[in-house]
A protein has these predicted regions:
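Flexible gly/pro-rich beta->alpha loop and the following alpha-helix that scaffold active-site loops
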Residues: 51-117
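…primarily DNA-binding HTH/wHTH and HhH modules…
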Residues: 288, 296, 310-341
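Basic/polar phosphate-binding segments, predominantly the helix-turn-helix DNA-binding elements
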Residues: 239-240, 245-281, 301-326
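N-terminal beta1-alpha1 cap of cysteine-dependent amidohydrolase-like domains
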Residues: 2-80
C-alpha cells in the first residue's frame, strides 16, 4: 500500500471511442473505498479515500461509443495532478493503426507519467502511442493482441494474462480489456488504499477476480480478409470439411500448389499455419458443442475430427487454458442460465 495523506487523485481518460461501462464503472469503483461498505453494513457512509474525475483533451462534452454522452470534469490544461491515470478500453478497428489519432493524449500521458503518475490501462494501445511500452511486457483484449504486437514491435504481449505490471517500479499496469477493468480497479485500490478496502469494494459490487485469464474467452481464429483467392477457396472448403482426417494434405491438393508454396501462402494470408488453422477451426466448433449440448467429450472429439479423445483433451487444454470438462462447467452453465431467462 502507498502511504499518503488525503484522497488519491484518479484521472480517468476519455476519448470519443471509450466504452461507457469501463469509464463510469471505474468512476463508481474508485468512489467507493472507505465510503460504501460502512454505509451498506451500518447506514453511515465512511470517508471517501479516492477522488476520481474524468479528463479529456478538452472539457467539452462528446458522444462516446454506443452514443453515451460524456462530459469530462477537466481538460488536460486544468486537470488536477493525478496520482493514477486510468485508460479504459475503447472501440477501434483491430485491423487499423491509430498512429496520429491520439497525439494529444499520448503527449499528456507521457508528461504525467514523467511527473510521477501511475498509468493503469485496459486499452494499452494508447500506452504504445505514447512510447511507454518499448521493451516492456503488456496485455490487452484478446481481439487486439495482433494490433498491439504488429504496431509496437518493442512490446512483449502476454495475451493469456488478465493483468500485467510493467515499467520502472511497476508504475504501468495493464488489464486485458472487457470486464477485466474490474481487476485493474481492485488492484489499484489495494495498492494505493489497502487490501481491506479493496476486499470491501469487491463485496459491495460482488466482483470476482478473472483468475482464468483471457484464454478461455478468446476466439482461436482471426478471420482476415485476403486477396488470395486460392487460400480463400481452401478456407471455405475447410469450413465445410474440418472433420476430414488429413485437412492440410486435402487443402494442398485443392490449391494445386506445391506443398511448401501452399504453406507459405496460407500462413501469409491467415496468420496461422494450415495445421494450426485446422485445429483452431475444430476447437472452436468443439467449444460451441460444449457450451450448448450435453454430448460426451469423447463423442465431441470424434465429431470435430479427432479419433483420439485424449489427444483432443490435451490439445484443448493447451490452446484454451481449461479442460473440456472445465470449459463446459464454466460456459455451459452460463448458456443454460441465459437460455432460461
Amino acid at each position: 500500500m502507498v502511504e499518503r495523506n488525503g484522497p488519491v487523485n484518479v484521472a480517468i481518460l476519455a476519448v470519443p471511442e471509450v466504452t461507457a461501462s469501463a469509464l463510469y464503472g471505474m468512476f463508481d469503483l474508485f468512489s467507493s473505498p472507505g465510503r460504501d461498505f460502512p454505509f451498506i453494513v451500518s447506514g453511515v457512509a465512511g470517508e471517501q479515500r479516492m477522488r476520481p474525475y474524468v479528463v479529456a483533451r478538452a472539457a467539452d462534452g462528446f458522444s462516446a461509443a454506443n452514443g453515451i454522452w460524456v462530459k469530462p470534469d477537466h481538460g488536460f490544461d486544468d486537470c488536477p495532478k493525478p496520482d493514477i491515470v486510468c485508460i479504459p478500453d475503447f472501440f477501434v478497428n483491430p485491423g487499423e493503426s491509430v498512429a496520429g489519432r491520439y497525439d494529444a493524449e499520448a503527449r499528456w500521458l507521457k508528461r504525467v507519467h514523467d511527473d510521477g503518475a501511475m498509468l493503469a490501462s485496459s486499452g494499452a494501445v494508447l500506452l504504445g502511442e505514447a512510447g511507454l511500452l518499448t521493451n516492456c511486457e503488456a496485455t490487452i483484449h484478446w481481439g487486439y493482441v495482433d494490433t498491439l504486437a504488429d504496431n509496437y514491435p518493442g512490446v512483449t504481449v502476454r495475451p493469456r494474462q488478465s493483468l500485467v505490471l510493467s515499467g520502472v517500479a511497476q508504475r504501468i499496469v495493464m488489464a486485458g480489456g472487457g470486464s477485466s477493468w474490474q481487476d485493474l480497479a481492485l488492484y489499484l485500490i489495494a495498492r494505493f488504499v489497502g487490501l481491506k478496502e479493496a476486499m470491501e469494494v469487491a463485496k459491495v459490487y460482488m466482483l470476482q477476480w478473472h483468475d482464468m485469464g483471457q484464454q478461455p474467452f478468446a476466439s482461436l481464429l482471426r478471420l482476415r480478409q485476403t486477396s488470395d483467392a486460392v487460400i480463400n477457396r481452401c478456407q471455405e472448403w475447410l469450413g465445410r470439411n474440418y472433420k476430414t482426417s488429413s485437412p492440410v494434405a486435402a487443402m494442398t491438393g485443392l490449391s494445386g500448389l506445391p506443398e511448401r508454396s501452399f504453406g507459405r501462402r496460407f500462413a501469409k494470408a491467415t496468420g496461422l499455419t494450415a495445421l494450426d488453422y485446422a485445429h483452431a477451426l475444430r476447437l472452436e466448433e468443439a467449444k460451441q458443442m460444449l457450451e450448448t449440448g450435453d454430448l460426451a467429450i469423447e463423442a465431441i472429439a470424434n465429431e470435430v475430427g479427432y479419433e483420439d479423445a485424449s489427444f483432443f483433451s490435451r490439445l484443448f487444454r493447451r490452446r484454451i487454458g481449461l479442460t473440456p470438462a472445465q470449459y463446459r462447467l464454466r460456459f455451459g452453465s452460463l448458456h443454460r442460465a441465459l437460455q432460461q431467462r
